[in-house]
Amino acid sequence: MNQDFWPFCLARLEQELPQQQFNTWIKTLQAAESDADGAVALTLTAPNRFVLQWVRERYMRRIGELGEEFHGQPIQLELQLPVAGAKSAPVAPARVRPAGANGGAAANSPMAPPVSEAAPPQIIVRPSEPEPVSANELAYDKTRLNADFTFDTLVTGRANDLARAAAMQVAQNPGTSYNPLFVYGGVGLGKTHLVHAIGNAVYRHNPRMVIRYVHVEDYYADVVRAYQQKSFDAFKRYYRSLDMLIIDDIQFFNNKNRTQEEFFHAFNALTEAKKQIVITCDTYPKDIQGLEDRLISRFDWGLTVQIEPPELEMRVAILQKKAEALRVSVDDDVAFLIAKNLRSNVRELEGALNKVVAYARFHGRGISLEVAKEALKDLLHAHNRQLSIEHIQKTVADYYKIKVADMHSKKRTRVIARPRQVAMWLAKELTPMSLPAIGEAFGGRDHTTVLHACRTITELRLGDHQLNHDVHVLTQVLRG
């Protein structure tokens, strides 16, 4: 057998994958090749079950495609764990066959590059004896983390750059950098993905770390259960024994006094022991209704970062990544159509793309701009009836207690100019209006004035907490 396939495969995957993904998942594999009776076989050994599962779910298909490309025939792939003492049960071998061969469905691989129109080979998993669950796998399950939510799979842009940078710093130095890390933003903007990515990165670096992701409602249920079963000592021991606590949607703590009391003491115990706490919320800490002041003050001990609605380019990138995961080809004009008309959150973007894909498949048509417009006609119609600049101007004027006429005036005093700039920024972000059209609506101003206003607000938000808070509140009000 030609023994050069694995080096060939490594070289190709290194070109196709981000360096971090390649080093973490592919470079750690050990390969053995054989060609018994003319059947080409490749056995890959993963260092642990976590890597094994990740490679099987995301990269096995692509390795099989490269094997068929190199050898000119389907190859048999086997993925296993190292033999230690007693013989380990290998993962079920996977044979790569041409399309049309009998077998099961192809595994999705969002990391693989787009494939040609020819049907790709399918991975057929042979039945095997159930494998024993390892201690590492059980430990990971207890974290309640989602293995799909990693820094690698997170689309980044201006909307989440600061939050991502802070999250990566926490992942590299848990308990010492930004404790607690408080991430806030609207629904569907990727807060949960980001905090899972922190947990996954920490666990991958040190599987001995005791990590727990918990939604606030589950934490509340744990408190109620401890109260009913009179087991508060066990409850306290568990939560205070964690190395990292990730708690999602803390706004739902409102008016749950006993739950807040228990979390307050757990928070103190963990931070004093330099254990990391990560929190998400849909609003800035001081705006949470029904939350004790002593908790809010402790959230200020670390770092508070906001995730904003994604900008146009980021929305397009999110759609293309989702299309890649769905293994469908989406032209830029289709992605731009969806991205221009859906501005609020990632879930809406992905939902719209799913609708287009389903519509195209149901009607037996390819995904085109015309098909996308047909599939989303109700959504596009609703969008066209959305915010007007006049409504934005009135809302901002009421908020800052100035006159709507001031939006059109030539006054340059700070109390007038800043709200006007905020209104221009909101008009650019929340409506499809062009810069010249926005300028015309603000007293016939030039488009360069609008551009300057938008850039000013964007830059000021990074350092001016009050302005950032104002823009966040106005955005939420205008979106209803």
UniProtKB/Swiss-Prot annotation:
Chain segments carrying region Domain II: 73-143
Keyword tags: ATP-binding, Cytoplasm, DNA replication, DNA-binding, Lipid-binding, Nucleotide-binding
Subcellular location as annotated: Cytoplasm
Pfam family, one: DnaA_N
UniProt keyword ATP-binding present: yes
Cross-referenced Gene3D superfamilies: 1.10.1750.10, 1.10.8.60, 3.30.300.180, P-loop containing nucleotide triphosphate hydrolases
Positions of the UniProt region annotated as Domain III, AAA+ region: 144-360
Region Domain IV, binds dsDNA, residue ranges: 361-480
SUPFAM superfamilies per the UniProt record, alphabetical: P-loop containing nucleoside triphosphate hydrolases, TrpR-like
InterPro entries per UniProt: AAA+_ATPase, Chromosome_initiator_DnaA, Chromosome_initiator_DnaA-like, Chromosome_initiator_DnaA_CS, DnaA_C, DnaA_dom, DnaA_N_dom, DnaA_N_sf
Superkingdom of the source species: Bacteria
Xref: PROSITE patterns: DNAA
UniProt KW Iron keyword: no
Binding, ATP: G188, G190, K191, T192
Entry text on domains: Domain I is involved in oligomerization and binding regulators, domain II is flexibile and of varying length in different bacteria, domain III forms the AAA+ region, while domain IV binds dsDNA.
Subunit structure, interactors included: Oligomerizes as a right-handed, spiral filament on DNA at oriC.
HAMAP family in the cross-refs: DnaA_bact (MF_00377)
Protein name listed in UniProt: Chromosomal replication initiator protein DnaA
Source organism (scientific name): Azoarcus sp. (strain BH72)
Taxonomic lineage of the native organism: Bacteria, Pseudomonadati, Pseudomonadota, Betaproteobacteria, Rhodocyclales
Gene this protein is translated from: dnaA
